[in-house]
C-alpha cells in the first residue's frame, strides 16, 4: 500500500527532484551556447577569461556570468581532454557554486564537475582550493584538470608533503590550488606561528570544494590537527605501568565497546593501588587523590591499549613503530599519533621504542578550519545519510545529482548466518562460483585482520587467484584497483572509501599502458601496442558485462550506512550492470554489540541448521535501525565536541587575528605603552586599596612589583610617607619613572631596532602563553564533565572558566611583555655553530622542521643580563644562546631544556 507521502512524491517529485529540475533553464542556456563556443579559435576561447574578469570589474556578479563561463569550460574540456561534461555534470557544478554538497555516484566524473565552479570562482582572483584526501589524488587531479585551466589562461598549483615555504607560497598564489585537507590545515597553523607576514604561505580562505566531503568533514571531524613539540622522556613509567595490566582479572575492569571506554572496578582499583604503591608510584592513600591525576591518566591509557585497541585492526606494527589504521578507509596513517599518551601506551604494549610525548603548540579541527572559508562546497558519492549533520554544523545542503545513465546494479538482501565460520564458508563458495563464470568480484572487509583471514582461508581451500588490497600494501593499490574489473578477477579490500580510482570493467587501459609501455619510446611501435591494449581491454569489458558486471560482496556491515553505500557504489558505474550483497553472522561486531542475542534465539526457534542462512528484508531493516542509532550517537558526540571546541576556536581567532595585526603594524610601540600603563594600574590598585588610609597601603609590595615588572628601584616607602600624598600621585610618579626608563632604552637601541625588539617580544611572549593556555584548556576539559554530578551544566562551566583563563592570559601577556622589555639589553655574541632545530610533529604528516628564526652568526642579538632573569618566569629571559646554561636552573644547556619548545 502506497502512503499518502509516497503518493505525493510520485505525483510531484521529491524536494530534491524539484530543486534539480530548477537548474534545467540554465542547462538549456549553456547548451544553446555550444555551437557559438565551437566556432571560436583556441585563442578566442582562452580570451574569454580576460573578458569575464573585465565584466566582473564593471559590476557583474559570478551568477551573471555563470552560463557563458560554464559553456567555455565545457568546450575547453572537450578540446584539451576529449571529455564533454554531461548535462547532469553541469547541474553538479551549479550545486557546488551555490554552496552545497553534490552527491554524485561513483564513475559520474566528480573531478571534471569541479572544473566548472572552480573556473567561475577563480575569475574573482582570490584563489580557489580543491581539497582531496591524499597527495596522489591532488597531484593527479591538478595535472589533468590543470590542463583545462592552463588552456584558459589560469595558473594551477598543487600542495603536497615535502614542499618548501617558497613552493607553497607560489602554489597558493595560483588561481587554482589542489591540496589535501591535512596540508591546508597545517599550513594555516604554521602560518600563525610565523613572525613576519612575508613568511606566511596562505593568502586567505575564499572558496573551497572538498572532494570526498563526508570523509573529511564527518569521519575526520573529531580528529584535531596538532603541531606539537617533544616533552621529557617518560618511557620507564609507561613500561612499568604496562606490566600491571596483564596481571588483572576480567572482574577488575569494565569494557564498553559501544562507547569505546574502559574503567577499573573497585577490586581492580584496589589491586592497582597495591602494585603502584610497591613500585613507589602512588602518592597518598588513594589512586584518585589529586596528586595522582597523572598516574590515573597513565593507567587508564594502558588499560585501553590492552583491552580496546586491537593489533591489525586499529593499528599495525611496522619497522618497530605503531602505525594507526584509519577505521573508515583501512589506510595506514604514518606520522599520525594518538594524543595524550595513548600512543606511548600502545608502544609499551607492543614492546617497541617509546617515542617522547608531545606538547601541543597549535591545533585546530577540520570542522573549524573549513568553516573559515567565505564559501564552502563538497562532492561525494554518499552524503544523504549525513544530510542533517552537514546542515547543522556547516550550513550545507545535500542535493543528489541524477546519474547520466540509469543504475542497473541489483542490491540483494543480506544473508545472515549464525557463526563467522559458516559465513566465511558461504563466502568462499560464492567467490569460487563468481570466478568460474568470469564475473569480476570485489570482496569488502572491515579490517586488515579480516582481509588476511579470508585470504588465508581461500588459500587453504585451494583458491589463490585473488589480490589483497589493504593498508599493508597501499603502494600497489592504484594498479590493483585499476585491474579489479577484469573478468574473473577477485580483489579482497578493506573499506574502499576515498580510494579515488574507479573500477572499470575490463580493466583500466591507461594504467596498463603506463605500466606495460613505460620503457617504450613514442613512435609507431608504441602507438600500435597502445591500440592493441585498448582493443584487448574492450573485449575483456564485453566479457565482464556478459558475466553480470562487477559483483561487490561485503563480509560485514560497517557501523555507518554511508561506508556500506560507498562499497556498493563501486559496482554499476556509468550504467554498467552489477550486483551487491552482504554476508553477515551473529558474531559480527555490529550484530554482537547491538543485540544479536534475541535474533539468535529466534533463528534457533525457526530451526535454522548449520550452514543455512536467513534472507529477509526485515533483517536489512533491523540492521539499518542499528546503524542509524550508531550514526545518531556519533553525530551527537561530534556536535557536543564542537560546542566545546568552539570555545577554543573563538579564542584562537582572537589570538591569530591579533598576531596578524601585530605583524602588519608599522610599529607596536603604542600597544606596548598601553600594556605598560595597564600593568601600572593593576599593581597600584592591588597595593593601594580604594578609599584606604595611607597607613593601609602596601608600600613594600608595590616597591617589589615595580622592581619585578619595570626593573626599577623606586623610593615608594618615602613617597607614601609624604604628607597629603594621594593614590594618583603615586601612580603618576611610577608612570613618569617607567616612561623615562623606557625612553632611554629606546634611544640607546635606535628606532629601527627598538621596533624589531618590541614586535619580537610581544609575538614570542604571546605564543608562549598561548601554548600554555591550550594545555590549561585541555586539562580543564578533561575534568569538567564531573561538574554534571553537582547538577551544573559542564558546557556552561567550561565556557565560564575558559573565559577566566583567557582573561588571565591577557593579563599575563601585559605583565610578561612589560617585564621583558624593561630588562632587554643589546649584547654581541660570538658566531655559533649552526644547530639543528628540535623536531616538531604534526599529526597526519611526517615530522616537520620549523624555519630557523635565530639570528645569523655575527648579527646583533637581544639578551637579558643573567642577574635580571627570573628562573621561574621564561618571559624575563630574553634571548638565550642555545649552548648557554638554561636560566631555569636545571643545569642543562638551554637547547636541551626550555629551548626545545622554540618553534
Swiss-Prot record:
Keyword Signal (UniProt): no
GO cellular component, one term: cell envelope Sec protein transport complex
Location in the cell: Cell inner membrane; Cytoplasm
EC number assigned by the record: 7.4.2.8
InterPro entries, per the entry: Helicase_ATP-bd, P-loop_NTPase, SEC_C_motif, SecA, SecA_CS, SecA_DEAD, SecA_motor_DEAD, SecA_preprotein_X-link_dom
Key word Cytoplasm present: yes
Cofactor dependency: Zn(2+)
Gene3D superfamilies membership: 3.10.450.50, Helical scaffold and wing domains of SecA (1.10.3060.10), P-loop containing nucleotide triphosphate hydrolases (3.40.50.300), SecA, preprotein cross-linking domain (3.90.1440.10)
UniProt: ATP binding residues: 89, 107-111, 502
Residue numbers binding Zn(2+): 886, 888, 897-898
Membrane disposition: Peripheral membrane protein
Catalytic activity, as annotated: ATP + H2O + cellular proteinSide 1 = ADP + phosphate + cellular proteinSide 2
Cofactor note: May bind 1 zinc ion per subunit.
Keywords assigned: ATP-binding, Cell inner membrane, Cell membrane, Cytoplasm, Membrane, Metal-binding, Nucleotide-binding, Protein transport, Translocase, Translocation, Transport, Zinc
One of the record's GO molecular function terms: protein-exporting ATPase activity
GO BP terms: intracellular protein transmembrane transport; protein import; protein targeting; protein transport by the Sec complex
Leading EC class: translocase
Oligomeric and partner information: Monomer and homodimer. Part of the essential Sec protein translocation apparatus which comprises SecA, SecYEG and auxiliary proteins SecDF-YajC and YidC.
Function: Part of the Sec protein translocase complex. Interacts with the SecYEG preprotein conducting channel. Has a central role in coupling the hydrolysis of ATP to the transfer of proteins into and across the cell membrane, serving both as a receptor for the preprotein-SecB complex and as an ATP-driven molecular motor driving the stepwise translocation of polypeptide chains across the membrane.
Family: Belongs to the SecA family.
Name under which the protein is recorded: Protein translocase subunit SecA
Species of origin: Rhizobium meliloti (strain 1021) (Ensifer meliloti)
Amino acid at each position: 500500500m502506497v502512503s499518502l507521502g509516497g503518493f505525493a512524491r510520485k505525483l510531484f517529485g521529491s524536494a530534491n527532484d524539484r530543486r534539480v529540475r530548477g537548474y534545467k533553464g540554465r542547462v538549456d542556456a549553456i547548451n544553446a551556447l555550444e555551437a557559438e563556443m565551437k566556432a571560436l579559435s583556441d585563442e578566442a576561447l582562452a580570451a574569454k577569461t580576460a573578458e569575464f574578469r573585465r565584466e566582473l570589474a564593471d559590476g557583474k556578479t559570478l551568477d551573471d556570468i555563470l552560463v557563458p563561463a560554464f559553456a567555455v569550460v565545457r568546450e575547453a574540456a572537450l578540446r584539451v581532454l576529449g571529455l564533454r561534461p554531461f548535462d547532469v555534470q553541469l547541474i553538479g557544478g551549479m550545486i557546488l557554486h551555490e554552496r552545497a554538497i553534490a552527491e554524485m555516484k561513483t564513475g559520474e566524473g566528480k573531478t571534471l564537475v569541479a572544473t566548472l565552479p572552480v573556473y567561475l570562482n577563480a575569475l574573482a582572483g582570490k584563489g580557489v582550493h580543491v581539497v582531496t584526501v591524499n597527495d596522489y589524488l591532488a597531484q593527479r587531479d591538478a595535472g589533468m584538470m590543470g590542463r583545462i585551466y592552463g588552456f584558459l589562461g589560469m595558473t594551477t598549483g598543487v600542495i603536497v608533503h615535502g614542499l618548501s615555504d617558497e613552493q607553497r607560497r607560489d602554489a597558493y598564489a595560483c588561481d587554482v590550488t589542489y591540496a589535501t585537507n591535512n596540508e591546508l590545515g597545517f599550513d594555516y597553523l604554521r602560518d600563525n606561528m610565523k613572525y613576519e607576514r612575508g613568511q606566511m604561505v596562505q593568502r586567505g580562505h575564499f572558496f573551497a570544494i572538498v572532494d570526498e566531503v563526508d570523509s573529511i568533514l564527518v569521519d575526520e571531524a573529531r580528529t584535531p590537527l596538532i603541531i606539537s613539540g617533544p616533552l621529557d622522556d617518560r618511557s620507564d613509567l609507561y613500561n612499568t605501568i604496562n606490566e600491571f595490566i596483564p596481571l588483572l582479572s576480567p572482574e577488575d575492569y569494565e569494557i564498553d565497546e559501544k562507547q569505546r571506554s574502559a574503567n577499573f572496578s573497585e577490586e581492580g582499583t584496589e589491586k592497582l593501588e597495591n602494585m603502584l604503591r610497591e613500585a613507589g608510584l602512588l602518592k597518598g592513600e588513594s589512586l584518585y587523590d589529586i596528586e595522582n591525576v597523572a598516574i590515573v591518566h597513565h593507567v587508564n591509557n594502558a588499560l585501553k591499549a590492552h583491552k580496546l585497541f586491537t593489533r591489525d585492526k586499529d593499528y599495525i606494527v611496522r619497522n618497530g613503530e605503531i602505525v594507526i589504521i584509519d577505521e573508515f578507509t583501512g589506510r595506514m596513517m604514518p606520522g599520525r599519533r594518538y594524543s595524550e599518551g595513548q600512543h606511548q601506551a600502545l608502544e609499551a604494549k607492543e614492546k617497541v621504542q617509546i617515542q617522547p610525548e608531545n606538547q601541543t603548540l597549535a591545533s585546530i579541527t577540520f570542522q573549524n578550519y573549513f568553516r573559515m572559508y567565505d564559501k564552502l562546497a563538497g562532492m561525494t558519492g554518499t552524503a544523504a545519510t549525513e544530510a542533517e549533520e552537514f546542515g547543522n554544523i556547516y550550513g550545507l545542503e545535500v542535493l543528489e545529482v541524477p546519474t547520466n545513465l540509469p543504475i542497473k546494479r541489483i542490491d540483494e538482501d543480506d544473508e545472515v548466518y549464525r557463526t563467522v565460520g559458516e559465513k566465511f564458508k558461504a563466502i568462499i563458495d560464492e567467490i569460487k562460483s563468481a570466478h568460474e563464470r568470469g564475473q569480476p568480484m570485489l570482496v569488502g572487509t572491515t579490517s586488515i585482520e579480516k582481509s588476511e583471514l579470508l585470504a588465508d582461508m581461500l588459500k587453504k581451500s585451494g583458491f589463490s587467484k585473488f589480490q589483497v588490497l589493504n593498508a599493508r600494501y597501499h603502494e600497489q593499490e592504484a594498479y590493483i584497483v585499476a585491474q579489479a574489473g577484469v573478468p574473473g578477477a577477485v580483489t579482497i579490500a578493506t573499506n574502499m572509501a576515498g580510494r579515488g580510482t574507479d573500477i572499470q570493467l575490463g580493466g583500466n587501459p591507461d594504467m596498463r599502458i603506463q605500466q606495460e609501455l613505460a620503457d617504450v619510446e613514442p613512435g609507431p611501435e608504441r602507438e600500435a601496442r597502445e591500440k592493441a591494449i585498448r582493443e584487448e581491454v574492450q573485449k575483456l569489458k564485453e566479457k565482464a558485462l556478459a558475466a553480470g558486471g562487477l559483483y561487490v560482496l561485503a563480509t560485514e556491515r560497517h557501523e555507518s550506512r554511508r561506508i556500506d553505500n560507498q562499497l556498493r557504489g563501486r559496482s554499476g558505474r556509468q550504467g554498467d550492470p552489477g550486483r551487491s550483497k552482504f554476508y553477515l553472522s551473529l558474531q559480527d561486531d555490529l550484530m554482537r554489540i547491538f543485540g544479536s542475542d534475541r535474533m539468535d534465539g529466534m533463528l534457533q526457534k525457526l530451526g535454522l541448521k548449520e550452514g543455512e542462512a536467513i534472507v529477509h528484508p526485515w533483517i536489512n531493516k533491523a540492521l539499518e535501525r542499528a546503524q542509524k542509532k550508531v550514526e545518531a550517537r556519533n553525530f551527537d558526540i561530534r556536535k557536543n565536541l564542537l560546542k566545546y571546541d568552539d570555545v577554543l576556536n573563538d579564542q584562537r581567532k582572537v589570538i591569530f587575528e591579533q598576531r596578524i595585526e601585530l605583524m602588519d603594524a608599522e610599529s607596536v610601540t603604542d600597544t606596548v605603552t598601553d600594556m605598560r600603563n595597564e600593568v601600572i594600574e593593576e599593581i597600584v590598585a592591588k597595593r593601594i586599596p580604594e578609599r584606604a588610609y595611607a597607613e593601609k597601603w602596601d608600600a613594600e609590595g608595590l616597591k617589589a612589583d615595580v622592581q619585578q615588572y619595570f626593573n626599577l628601584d623606586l623610593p615608594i616607602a618615602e613617597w607614601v610617607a609624604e604628607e597629603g600624598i594621594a593614590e594618583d600621585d603615586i601612580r603618576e610618579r611610577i608612570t613618569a619613572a617607567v616612561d623615562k626608563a623606557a625612553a632611554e632604552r629606546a634611544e640607546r637601541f635606535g628606532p629601527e631596532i627598538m621596533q624589531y625588539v618590541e614586535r619580537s617580544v610581544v609575538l614570542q611572549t604571546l605564543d608562549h602563553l598561548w601554548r600554555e593556555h591550550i594545555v590549561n584548556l585541555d586539562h580543564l576539559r578533561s575534568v569538567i564533565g564531573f561538574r554534571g554530578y553537582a547538577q551544573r551544566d559542564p558546557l556552561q562551566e567550561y565556557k565560564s572558566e575558559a573565559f577566566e583563563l583567557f582573561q588571565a592570559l591577557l593579563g599575563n601577556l601585559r605583565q610578561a611583555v612589560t617585564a621583558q622589555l624593561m630588562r632587554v639589553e643589546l649584547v654581541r655574541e660570538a658566531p655559533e655553530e649552526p644547530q639543528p632545530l628540535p623536531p616538531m610533529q604534526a599529526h597526519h604528516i611526517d615530522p616537520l622542521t620549523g624555519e630557523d628564526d635565530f639570528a645569523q652568526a655575527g648579527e646583533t642579538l637581544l639578551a637579558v643580563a643573567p642577574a635580571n632573569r627570573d628562573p621561574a618566569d621564561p618571559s624575563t629571559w630574553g634571548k638565550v644562546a642555545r649552548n648557554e646554561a638554561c636560566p631555569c636552573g636545571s643545569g642543562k644547556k638551554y637547547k636541551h631544556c626550555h629551548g626545545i619548545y622554540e618553534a
